[in-house]
Amino acid sequence: MTLSPEKEHVRPRDAADNDPVAVARGLAEKWRATAVERDRAGGSATAEREDLRASALLSLLVPREYGGWGADWPTAIEVVREIAAADGSLGHLFGYHLTNAPMIELIGSQEQEEHLYTQIAQNNWWTGNASSENNSHELDVKVSATPTEDGGYVLNGTKHFCSGAKGSDLLFVFGVVQDDSPQQGAIIAAAIPTSRAGVTPNDDWAAIGMRQTDSGSTDFHNVKVEPDEVLGAPNAFVLAFIQSERGSLFRPIAQLIFANVYLGIAHGALDAAREYTRTQARPWTPAGIQQATEDPYTIRSYGEFTIALQGADAAAREAAHLVQTVWDKGDALTPEDRGELMAKVSGVKSLATNAALNISSGVFEVIGARGTHPRYGFDRFWRNVRTHSLHDPVSYKIADVGKHTLNGQYPIPGFTS
C-alpha cells in the first residue's frame, strides 16, 4: 500500500507481556507531578506523548495477530480512565486515538486493516483526528475532495477541533466531493500520513480547558489521497449510520470514551482534594474540631462525591462490556443491538458529565479558600470537564434515554448518537 509515513519508531517491548492498566497507572503517576505546570503553560504535551509512544499503549486495540495488545473494550476504557485521572488533556488525546484506530476495521478493507494495524503496532503511530469543521452544522462539510483519474482524491480546505493532529503519524480526514462527477456531494473518509505535503496542523487551539490537546485547525492544500488510503466507498461512513451497520458503532464507542475521560478527571479531582484536606486544610473553628477531616459537612461531601462516582463507574463498566458484546457480533449486528447500546451509553454520558462537573466544582468546598491558589491547579479539573462536555449537549442524551424508556425509541444514529 502507498500509505507509509516517513518517520518510524522502534517498538520497545512486547505488549502482550504487560498489563496495560498497570502500564497506564505507572505513566499517570509520572505525569501527575507536572500536570499543573503543563496545564498552565498549554501548548503540546510532546514529552508525555512520547512516553505513551514508548509504552506501546498506542497499539492497545490492535489485534495480536498484527502485533498489538489485542485488548478488549473494557480494558481500553480502564486505561483511558487511569490516564485522564492524572491529566485530562492526555486522557482526551489517548481517548481520541482509540476512537480513530477502529475506523480502519469498521469501514476499511481487510487489506487496509492488516496494513494499518501492523504499522500502528510496529511503529507506535499516533493517530490524529481531522473530521470537524467550524460551519453552520456538523454535516456541513466544506473541505473538498476532488476525484483524480487513478481513483484517489485531492483535498483542499480547513478542518477545526483536530484533537491530536499535531504530532500524529496517521490522520483520519473527511471531505466532500464538490465536482460534477457522479460522486458529487458524497462524503469520503481517508487515512493519510500527517506528514503528507500540504497538510498543516496549526498552533491555534485556545480554550479554558484541555489546553494540551492540540485541538486547533488543520489546513489541507492540494493534499493527495491515494486510492488505497480511501476508507470504504463514497458515503460508506454516512450510510453505515443510516442503516445502523457496524461502521455506526464509531459513535457509541466515542461517546463512552468521552464519558470515561470525564470520570477519570473526576477521580483525579477527588484524589487531589482528599490529599489536600488530609494534609493542608484547616478546621473551621466554630465546628469545635481539631482537624478538617473531622468536619461532618466535609465528610458528607466526600461521601456524596464517592457515591456519585461509584454509580457512574459501575454504569460505565457495564456499558463497556456491552460494547464488547456488540462489537463481537461483527456484521451480524442488528439495529436493535446498536440502539440498545447507544441508549445505554447515552445514560452513562449523562451520569459521567454530571458527576464530573459536580465533583470538580464541589471539591473547592472541602479544600477551602487557600486551595484556590493557582499553584494547586484545582481549577484544571473543572475547566477540562466543562470544555469537553460541551462537545455535544448532554440534554439530548438524557432525552434519548427518556424516549427509549417511555416510548421504546432508539437514539437516531448520527455523528453524536
Swiss-Prot record:
What's the protein here called?
Dibenzothiophene monooxygenase
Q: Which Gene3D superfamilies match?
A: Acyl-CoA dehydrogenase/oxidase, N-terminal domain, Butyryl-CoA Dehydrogenase, subunit A, domain 2, Butyryl-CoA Dehydrogenase, subunit A, domain 3
Question: EC number(s) in its UniProt entry?
Answer: 1.14.14.21
Broad class of enzyme this protein falls into? oxidoreductase
Q: List the induction conditions.
A: Repressed by HBP or sulfate. Part of the dszA-dszB-dszC operon. This protein is expressed at high levels (at protein level).
Catalysed reaction(s) here are:
dibenzothiophene + 2 FMNH2 + 2 O2 = dibenzothiophene 5,5-dioxide + 2 FMN + 2 H2O + 2 H(+); dibenzothiophene + FMNH2 + O2 = dibenzothiophene 5-oxide + FMN + H2O + H(+); dibenzothiophene 5-oxide + FMNH2 + O2 = dibenzothiophene 5,5-dioxide + FMN + H2O + H(+)
Q: State its location(s).
A: Cytoplasm
Q: How is it used?
A: Expression in B.subtilis confers the ability to remove sulfur from polycyclic aromatic sulfur compounds found in gasoline and diesel (biodesulfurization), which are a considerable source of pollution. Modification of the operon so the start codon of dszB no longer overlaps with the stop codon of dszA leads to increased expression of DszB (in R.erythropolis) and about 5-fold higher levels of desulfurization of DBT. Rearrangement of the operon into the order dszB-dszC-dszA leads to 12-fold higher levels of DBT desulfurization.
> What species was this sequence derived from?
Rhodococcus erythropolis (Arthrobacter picolinophilus)
Q: Which family does it belong to?
A: Belongs to the DszC flavin monooxygenase family.
Keywords, A to Z, come to: Cytoplasm, Flavoprotein, FMN, Monooxygenase, Nucleotide-binding, Oxidoreductase
Pathway listed = Sulfur metabolism; dibenzothiophene degradation
